[in-house]
Amino acid sequence: MRTRRVYLPLKGELSMDWHDYLGPLGRGAWVTIQFTLYSMFFGAVCSFAFGIGKLSKNPFVKGFSILYIEIFRGTSLLVQLFWLFFALPIAGDMMGIDLRLSPVVAGVLALSLNLGAYGAEIVRGAIQAVSPSQYEAATALNFSSSQALWRVALPQAIPEMMPSFSNLAIAALKDTSLVSLITLHDLTFAAEQLRNFYQDSTTVYTMVLLMYFGIALVLSFFMRLIESSVTRWRGHRR
């Protein structure tokens, strides 16, 4: 993912026309959309990995999954972002290891890990909500524990997860605004630059508000499409 710099006119070219804001805000919005999609993808991977891990019979896997979930649910996303970007390199220098992360990597990593911690609880809850009779039927068919999970529990649990994952997707979109604090040129960063230059807070932040709302509407629409597809897929399996 590449971020773009926001180019502003010279002060002699100062203009209060809202059309002048569209270019910088549009480029910032594209960065925001990319961060949202990346964090959703990697967050979903973490959700299933650690949600299933929390149900594991292996004490190490279960313990590590619980530790991850509690740490990232119990601490601020902003602090997690700052720790990865500012504190981790210092800790690495103390150990003689280069642990410096680019703003893009630090941003995606923090958003994904935080999203995954909340998603893991959704996955765990949906799997545990599957009727015990389904597991009994799987046992009667001589399924192993992993076969029962992948062939019986998950196909029934995934449709139940989708509404909650849709909410997490919207939360991920809004959380991307924090990456502006580590110098990433997202929509919020572009808005702050425009506000500082033009001193036109009302117009700039009204446009940003509408752009976030528009992105959220599109994201909600696609999440509903995915939810409908998953529901139809489940119906075909019956």
Curated annotation (Swiss-Prot):
Domain ABC transmembrane type-1: 29-223
Matching PROSITE patterns: ABC_TM1
BP-aspect Gene Ontology terms: amino acid transport
Broad class of the protein's primary localization: membrane
Annotated transmembrane regions: 33-53, 77-97, 103-123, 152-172, 203-223
Cellular localisation: Cell inner membrane
Keywords, alphabetical: Amino-acid transport, Cell inner membrane, Cell membrane, Membrane, Plasmid, Transmembrane, Transmembrane helix, Transport
Entry GO CC: ATP-binding cassette (ABC) transporter complex
GO molecular function: transmembrane transporter activity
Membrane topology recorded in Swiss-Prot or TrEMBL: Multi-pass membrane protein
Family note: Belongs to the binding-protein-dependent transport system permease family. HisMQ subfamily.
Function: Probably part of the binding-protein-dependent transport system y4tEFGH for an amino acid. Probably responsible for the translocation of the substrate across the membrane.
Name the record gives this protein: Probable amino-acid ABC transporter permease protein y4tF
Organism: Sinorhizobium fredii (strain NBRC 101917 / NGR234)
